[in-house]
Amino acid sequence: MIRRLEYYGSPILRKKSSPIAEITDEIRNLVSDMCDTMEAHRGVGLAAPQVGKNVSLFVMCVDRETEDGELIFSESPRVFINPVLSDPSETPIIGKEGCLSIPGLRGEVFRPQKITVTAMDLNGKIFTEHLEGFTARIIMHETDHLNGVLYIDLMEEPKDPKKFKASLEKIKRRYNTHLSKEELVS
């Protein structure tokens, strides 16, 4: 089932997600719905807060990146429950990022080239992976969502900050019609 996305201005995008203690049918259904939602919106990753759930979980459809930068997509989306990042490489690189919760905008963000992630899969098995390049960037971006951080908090100053801010306000008003003005946050 495709779920409604939460957009910039929704308070859940600014909250730290709760760890998942047990993999229940509710969590399995959430993962299935998140995969459907990510695919419907043509995303490469999606965190639970982006579909209104404050739990530490994200899905991703990229398996890895080749040496020449080609993305290898997974047969089925990959699940990361309670992810923990470690061992970031020292030299950051800049790359463009976008977000399904901030449609139409992109920004340049410095992130480590390499990262290690330890998480649990949908079967409850703990795994550790060493990732680099765009795949590592996706992992860091989605993990940021679980901590209430958006890429716009980390990005380099946009070329036209006033126009960028106006675009954010437009997203806040256009996509959050289910929220009252008092509920909206930046």
From Swiss-Prot:
It comes from Chlamydia pneumoniae (Chlamydophila pneumoniae). One of its GO terms (molecular function) is peptide deformylase activity. Pfam families: Pep_deformylase. Removes the formyl group from the N-terminal Met of newly synthesized proteins. Requires at least a dipeptide for an efficient rate of reaction. N-terminal L-methionine is a prerequisite for activity but the enzyme has broad specificity at other positions. This is Peptide deformylase. InterPro entries: Peptide_deformylase, Peptide_deformylase_sf. The gene is def. Binds 1 Fe(2+) ion. NCBIfam families: pept_deformyl (TIGR00079), PRK00150.1-3 (NF001159). Transmembrane segments: none annotated. Coiled coil: none annotated. PANTHER family: PEPTIDE DEFORMYLASE.
